[in-house]
Structures are given as structure tokens and as C-alpha cells.
């Protein structure tokens, strides 16, 4: 089953945050000491336009390189800029599959979807 994760809008995605942002602290939890210099951010799955907004926002905070690290395990693609995910029961769509099987399936999905318009995928980092 496929799910649309977000709309392709020129805004920051929901839950966008950086380690420099202010947030509530709980005195019973460890401190955030050192995190404000770590220069990391996170968000929900961005659309293609939202990814551009993230890059623009982060560019105001650093002159160095910006790396996208994709930690999602389920297969996900951009279709006309809209992020979509393939998932199964309990979000276990890829459970039990080899890495190569998943990569081959993702390539097949992208090729099939690409016949109907532009599609893009995030490349999994290892």
C-alpha cells in the first residue's frame, strides 16, 4: 500500500527543528549541553519543495556542507515532488527482505512510476 506523506508546498515540513532551537527542558532528564554546536536538524518526511526550504534555512546557519541522512526503513519516493511511502502492516513492508531485494524493488517502483511522470527517490545511506 502507498501513502502520501506530505503536500508539495514551499514551506518547512511539519516538526522541523534544529539543535540550536529553544525547547522545553526537563530537569529530570540529561541536559542538552553540547547539542547546540552539533548542527543537526530533523523533520517529518519533506516534499521536494520543502527539502529546498530546509536547505535554504540551513544555509543561513552554516557555510559548510549539508548532508541528508535518511533513516527511514520503508521504501519511499518522490512522485511529482510529493513524498510517498510504501508500507505494510505495522510498518513492516520490508521486514525479512535482503538489502538487495529492497533496492531492486525500489528501482522497479521508481521505473514504473516514472512512466507516468517524473519520480525521484532518496538514496539509502549505509
Language-model-detected regions and their locations in the chain:
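Cys-dependent protein tyrosine phosphatase-like superfamily
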Residues: 1-126
